[in-house]
Amino acid sequence: MLKDMNSFRQRTGRTLYEKSIFYKVSCVLLFIMVFINVTFPKAGIKLGGIPLTVGNVFLMLTIMMWFFYVIWKRCFVFSTAEKYVILGCIYWLIRFMFTMVGGRVGLSDWVGFFVPLVIYPFTFIVMNYFITEQKQIDFIIRMLLWGTVIVFVFGFLQAAFGIEKFSIPGLTVNYTDYISSTNWYAEKYNGVQEGVTYSKTVSTYQNGNLLGVNILLFCPMIYESIENKTWRNIYMLVFILFCILTGSKTCWVGIFIYLFIKVIVIVNRKWADGRKVQFACLVIAMIPVVAAIFLGMFPQIMERFKDSFTFKNINDLSGRSQSMNELINYFIVKTEWILTGPYGLTAYWGSSYEMAYFCILMLGGIAGLIAFLGPIMFILIKYTGKHIKESRILKGITHGVIVYIIIAFVEGALWLPPTAINLWMVLALGYKMSLFMEENRK
């Protein structure tokens, strides 16, 4: 912590730097990048099947600005958390170099894993570098609040009138996907029932599961940031109803976990009197009733909801359990590959694209799992989680990341932009807020 605080003081004391045009331009790029990746993450086109989104372009521009400044000024000052993030990226860079040399998979196959594991973590680095004041964090969170409002509005309009009627090519849906098919949303694994053309609500994310995972990640933070109690409760209600409307079973489980965490926090809160606990329990008890009425307006979603939580479907993990079991059996037989993973180096059986941790084991083994989860857990435990009793926003960040870590066992959407970007963005905001709080105590 002391080393991180020294690094923090060196950065926040750069008055001339903060007044420079370079810094102001970098901040503008950063703010645009954050807003786009939360609000319009699919804006852009595809080149050779690889998404070239506006959010990715602004992220790369921001990283380039950071990189040029570090080289130009020889400012090689990194906090402990940043070092862990960079070490994780270095591991994955080396691992994918071996993948490339192995020649068993083509560039178009492994680049989709490379970018989220090697490039997107630098979101944390650049945000930590360019954010030097608490008011910048406040501005970003306000920006994200209005961004999620836009996402909610698009989603509800699509659910009511049809996705095709409320889609803007190149902005709310990738332009290449849009022109390739008039039924593009049905081709993105958005069906809610076999043989039924009704699609999950996708809003501006183009995929129901991707939408659900991302709003679970950052909406708890935004909810806690709202000062007015009435508006905060309205936001929570809209958030819950929107999660139901996504049609994503992963999102449904995630919102249940989030509400369960909220209940535990309320009951264990030392200052909570009996009336507050009773009121909280009453509100939570009403949620299934409101949800049932809401689902009655969307019979396809209701049918999916009833079919989703049978023993057979839970055990099947939405069709993922068979390939996951095959991968586990592979590691039992080929234990020599458990450390670094077989991907691109040898033949293997089984797969686990959606299940983030099993996919990471396939790509980089246990070492890869440590390289990915290690920095996240370090930031979560030593920084954001340490101050949750002092800051509602940090509490929301911690809850959102914990929910993501849990649901990523089944559906992490890690390989689809903007999940990894938003994950590191939320962690960066929590980490930086923790440092500001430590600094204010001095």
Task: Identify the meaning behind each predicted range.
Residues 25-44, 58-125, 401-408:
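N-terminal hydrophobic segments of proteins, predominantly signal-anchor/transmembrane helices
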Residues 260, 397-407, 414-442:
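Transmembrane alpha-helices of multi-pass inner-membrane enzymes
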Residues 141-168, 174-247, 252-265, 378:
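Alpha-helical transmembrane segments of multi-pass inner-membrane proteins
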Residues 153, 157-163, 246, 266-311, ...:
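A membrane-periplasm/extracellular boundary helix in multi-pass inner-membrane enzymes
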Residues 226-233, 256-268, 276, 281, ...:
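Hydrophobic transmembrane alpha-helices and their immediate junctions
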Residues 1-25, 388-390, 426-442:
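A juxtamembrane structural motif centered on a specific transmembrane helix
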Residues 38-43, 47, 299-367, 384-386:
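Long extracytoplasmic/lumenal interhelical loops at the membrane interface
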Residues 23-27, 80-91, 126-173, 396:
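Interfacial loop-to-transmembrane-helix boundary motif in multi-pass membrane proteins
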